[in-house]
């Protein structure tokens, strides 16, 4: 099994280009089921993208892949969908597989999707996905680990209030509603940039969607959608991760190819810690200026601080000048990186959904193991900060969400290699 060997202590200096957003491209790929042809650019080279390609092909899609140095270009033809079951063997690899449920149901009146897998960071139930589709008139049963959904004729528009903000359920509801009969109004929706990107793609395909980027989205169903071409937005989680990498290594890095407004909350949090963060053309520049203040953090739905960056921020706070409180409001079990950080000398105490982080002068290299995607990269950041050697095991998680991570870090002076 592959591992990463990191020799830390080298400030990162240079520039990093940000790849397409994983959490945007996956629902956009699922949206291809709603039309006959979708051309997608700025597609990141990730195993989760490969899994979604495998899933769409299992449904009968024909996918042409054009490979460029820093991205994929996908041409997805879905005019011959002939299988309406998303099998366990594919779905177990990635939770995003559930996003074929809405498109298959709304276009073909039936879908059978295995209950999903993915990172082991909490229950992340599918109750809200099922509830909103039932409100649209679907008949849904859970049998033998599968969601069986069907409808007599087209599903119907509805008014639905999510009892809590759910990015995944918001996406499935939108994907279903664009071909539903009548008007759907969704309340308490996720407002994440990736949801906005999906809506913009659907609008380009001919969907009628209002309220994009707000908590109330109105969708007037269409009889069909058009072919389209769409460029996926850049990955704010990747951008934030490299911003923290610059900070934890006391470096100076330009993060390029990202819209500032979707990473502004990250930039403001770093400024609180004492970092210099300057908006530049097509990105930001993060510079360490000799201090690292301890700052409290709470994760919340967008525009709050992303749960997908909590672990990385915690790594940074292990080296801060005081005590910080990190509160995880989105997922349970998302402190699984804490024992590994403590193996490296961090002083962290977890109490329920809160972690108290007392800054130490320096972390020490160690052999550590990744439990999930974001935890794995937090341990890399910790390793980069040390003056010794860190070995990270179970790095297959990384390839699900970070394209060319070692190359991007090495180009800025990091000593990191995969063996």
Swiss-Prot record:
Source organism, top-level taxon: Bacteria
Compartments where located: Cytoplasm
Pathway assigned to this chain's UniProt record: Cell wall biogenesis; peptidoglycan biosynthesis
InterPro entries: Enolpyruvate_Tfrase_dom (IPR001986), Enolpyruvate_Tfrase_sf (IPR036968), MurA_subfamily (IPR050068), RNA3'P_cycl/enolpyr_Trfase_a/b (IPR013792), UDP_GlcNAc_COvinyl_MurA (IPR005750)
GO CC annotations on file: cytoplasm
GO molecular function: UDP-N-acetylglucosamine 1-carboxyvinyltransferase activity
Active site: 119
Keyword list, A-Z: Cell cycle, Cell division, Cell shape, Cell wall biogenesis/degradation, Cytoplasm, Peptidoglycan synthesis, Pyruvate, Transferase
Reactions catalysed: phosphoenolpyruvate + UDP-N-acetyl-alpha-D-glucosamine = UDP-N-acetyl-3-O-(1-carboxyvinyl)-alpha-D-glucosamine + phosphate
GO biological process: cell division; cell wall organization; peptidoglycan biosynthetic process; regulation of cell shape; UDP-N-acetylgalactosamine biosynthetic process
Gene3D superfamilies per UniProt: Enolpyruvate transferase domain
Top EC group: transferase
Residues annotated as binding UDP-N-acetyl-alpha-D-glucosamine: 95, 164-167, 308, 330
Binding site for phosphoenolpyruvate: 22-23
EC number: 2.5.1.7
Modified-residue entries (2-(S-cysteinyl)pyruvic acid O-phosphothioketal), positions: 119
Keyword Transferase: yes
Pfam families on file: EPSP_synthase
Similarity remark: Belongs to the EPSP synthase family. MurA subfamily.
Function in brief: Cell wall formation. Adds enolpyruvyl to UDP-N-acetylglucosamine.
Protein name in UniProt: UDP-N-acetylglucosamine 1-carboxyvinyltransferase
Gene name tied to this protein: murA
């Amino acid at each position: 099994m592959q591992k990463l060997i990191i020799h830390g202590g080298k400030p990162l200096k240079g520039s990093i280009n940000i790849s397409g957003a994983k959490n945007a491209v996956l629902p956009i790929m699922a949206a291809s089921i709603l039309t006959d042809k979708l051309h997608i650019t700025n597609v990141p080279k990730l195993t989760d993208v490969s899994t979604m390609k495998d899933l769409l092909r299992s449904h009968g899609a024909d996918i042409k892949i054009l490979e460029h140095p820093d991205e994929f270009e996908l041409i997805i033809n879905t005019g011959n969908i002939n299988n309406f079951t998303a099998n366990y063997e594919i779905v177990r690899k990635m939770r995003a597989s559930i996003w074929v449920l809405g498109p298959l149901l709304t276009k073909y009146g039936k879908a059978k999707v295995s209950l999903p897998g993915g990172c082991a960071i909490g229950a992340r139930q599918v109750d809200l996905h099922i509830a909103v589709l039932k409100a649209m008139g679907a008949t849904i049963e859970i049998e033998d680990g599968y969601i069986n959904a069907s409808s007599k004729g087209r599903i119907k528009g509805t008014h639905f209030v999510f009892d809590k903000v759910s990015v995944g359920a918001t996406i499935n509801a939108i994907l279903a509603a664009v071909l539903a009969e009548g008007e759907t109004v969704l309340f308490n929706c996720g407002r994440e940039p990736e949801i906005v990107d999906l809506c913009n793609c659907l609008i380009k395909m001919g969907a009628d969607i209002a309220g994009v980027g707000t908590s109330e989205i109105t969708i007037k169903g269409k009889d069909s959608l058009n072919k389209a071409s769409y460029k996926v937005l850049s990955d704010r989680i990747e951008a934030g991760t490299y911003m923290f990498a610059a900070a934890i290594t006391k470096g100076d890095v330009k993060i390029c190819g990202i819209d500032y407004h979707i990473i502004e909350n990250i930039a403001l949090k770093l400024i609180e810690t004492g970092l210099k963060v300057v908006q530049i053309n097509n990105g930001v520049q993060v510079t360490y200026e000799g201090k690292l203040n301890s700052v409290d953090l709470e994760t919340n739905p967008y525009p709050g601080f992303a749960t997908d960056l909590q672990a990385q921020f915690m790594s940074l706070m292990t080296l801060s000048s005081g005590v910080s409180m990190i509160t995880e409001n989105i997922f349970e079990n998302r402190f699984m990186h804490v024992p590994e950080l403590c193996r490296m000398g961090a002083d962290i105490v977890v109490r329920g959904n809160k972690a108290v982080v007392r800054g130490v002068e320096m972390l020490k290299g160690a052999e550590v193991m990744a439990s999930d995607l974001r935890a794995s990269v937090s341990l890399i950041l910790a390793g980069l900060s040390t003056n010794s050697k860190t070995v990270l095991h179970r790095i297959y998680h990384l390839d699900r969400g970070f394209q060319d991570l070692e190359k991007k870090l090495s180009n800025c002076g990091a000593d990191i290699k995969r063996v």
